[in-house]
A protein has these predicted regions:
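Structural signature of hydrophobic alpha-helical transmembrane segments
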Residues: 11-12, 34-46, 109-119
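C-terminal transmembrane helix-loop-helix hairpin of multi-pass membrane proteins
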Residues: 102-173
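Hydrophobic alpha-helical transmembrane segments and adjacent interfacial helices
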Residues: 20-31, 49-55
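Alpha-helical membrane segments in multi-pass integral membrane proteins
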Residues: 66-127
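Small-residue-rich segments of transmembrane alpha-helices in multi-pass membrane proteins
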Residues: 15-28, 70-83, 148
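Helix-coil boundary and interhelical linker segments in multi-pass alpha-helical membrane proteins
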Residues: 24-37, 170-173
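Cytoplasmic-side transmembrane-helix entry/capping segments in multi-pass membrane proteins
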Residues: 8-18, 37-43, 64-74
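Short, small-residue-biased leader/transition segments that mark boundaries at the very start
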Residues: 1-6
């Protein structure tokens, strides 16, 4: 009983922290581009709804697709870390300024769109995890883990859509 109380408290603190961080990031985007938050939230909700309908119709993510998604996710994480390291070590180098210039143009929009597609496909994996958890009759603890994964997936999709909209808006200027 006591352990469950600590876990509940930790989850609440984590959720509040995540909410504040998400609000802070959204406010930064909102200061730069008017109306972008409403657009991002609307597109995120529409995407989740469409993906839920598609999943309910029987479309599934195969094992090869899951492997490709995880690979893409790891490549993007490692690439992002390398970019941050380059920005920290050599912010005025030709390589860094070239990457920034490319990232703010059409190629950056393309990569942002690919990020949205990866986030959407990962959401399909979350739907499958939830379905398998329920069908196999796993304990409620695993249902909570699966629902947590879904929430993280929706937040990730929102951030990717927000990034894509910002790149599109920035490219119009």
């Amino acid at each position: 009983q006591r352990q469950m109380c600590i876990r509940d408290r930790t989850g609440s603190i984590y959720s509040a922290g995540m909410g504040y961080a998400l609000t802070f990031m959204s406010m930064i985007y909102a200061m730069q581009w008017k109306g972008i938050i409403v657009e991002a939230v609307t597109l995120t909700l529409l995407t989740v709804a469409v993906l839920a309908v598609i999943y309910s119709k029987g479309v599934r993510v195969g094992s090869r697709m899951k492997t490709a998604l995880i690979t893409c996710l790891w490549v993007s994480i490692i690439g992002g870390l390398l970019f941050m390291l380059l920005a920290w070590l050599a912010p005025h180098s030709a390589i860094y300024t070239s990457i920034v210039a490319i990232n703010n143009g059409p190629i950056g929009i393309l990569f942002a769109a690919i990020g949205v597609l990866i986030a959407a496909a990962l959401l399909m994996c979350d739907f499958e995890t939830i379905q398998m958890t329920v069908e196999q009759g796993l304990p409620a603890q695993y249902e909570w883990y699966a629902s947590y994964g879904l929430i993280v997936g929706v937040i990730y999709l929102y951030l990717k859509i927000l990034n894509l909209l910002a790149k599109i808006a920035n490219n119009r200027k």
